[in-house]
Amino acid sequence: MSKKDFQIIKGHKHIPYRPQKYPEDVMIDRAKGFYEMARGRRTIRAFSKKPVPKEIMIDLIRTAGTSPSGAHKQPWTFCLVSNPVIKKQIRIAAEEEEYQSYHKRMSKEWLKDLEPMGTDWNKPFIETAPWLIVAFRKIYDMDENGFKTNNYYVTESIGLACGMLLLAINNAGLSALTHTPSPMNFLSSILDRPDNERPFLLIPVGYADDDAYVPDIHRKELDDICIVYE
């Protein structure tokens, strides 16, 4: 690489960034098209048992891995699970925690807010969906000498990565559910994850069942979420 192909900035090499550029009319079409794809995304709980190729799932994880992160630490691990024995273990443990949540931990207001979703402590989708993605946040890392190294904005970083993951799932023609049984420590034990990794999100992924229904709920209008300053 010749000298003109990079610059040294504050002692570190920086390479040129040449993003794809489009005419403005194409940009408008692409932005609207992406929005139309994204607005079709729904959380589902009725999955088809139709297999999903592992190759697709790997590319979805690759997409999540392109997310920005604090100090570029990339503080995440994504576990892909299709093994039926492991999925059953996860379901049993999740339902034990969810039973306690629905019967003892959740407030009346919380339970009332959940009523339109039609949910309860039973989580059959954990076994029905062909794949589970379990996202772990890495609260610290270890260097090659076994010393702890800091990670920064870990929750924000993995949240961004999971958002990109959900859009990638929808873009591929698949559906997903964001599931957060609380507490989730059982995921660390079942998947044998190290002490520096904490479970963040359990995402069943697959094709929507032909008879899938979703709640008749609506997203906020643009005026409720966007303020423009010109």
Segments (PLM) and residue ranges:
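Small-aliphatic-rich amphipathic alpha-helix that forms the alpha element of a beta-alpha
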Residues: 41, 59-65, 133, 139-190
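N-terminal accessory segments that position/regulate proteins before the catalytic core
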Residues: 1-44, 48-58, 89-92, 103-104
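C-terminal helix-cap and adjacent tail motif
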Residues: 2-26, 201-230
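Glycine/small-residue-rich phosphate/adenosyl-binding loop
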Residues: 4-7, 80-158
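Short loop-to-beta-strand entry elements in the cores of soluble alpha/beta enzymes
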Residues: 71-82
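Glycine-rich, charged/polar anion/phosphate-binding loops
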Residues: 63-65, 116-121, 187-189, 212
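Glycine-rich phosphate/pyrophosphate-binding beta-alpha loops
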Residues: 65-71
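A glycine-rich helix N-cap at a beta->alpha junction
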Residues: 98-106, 192-215
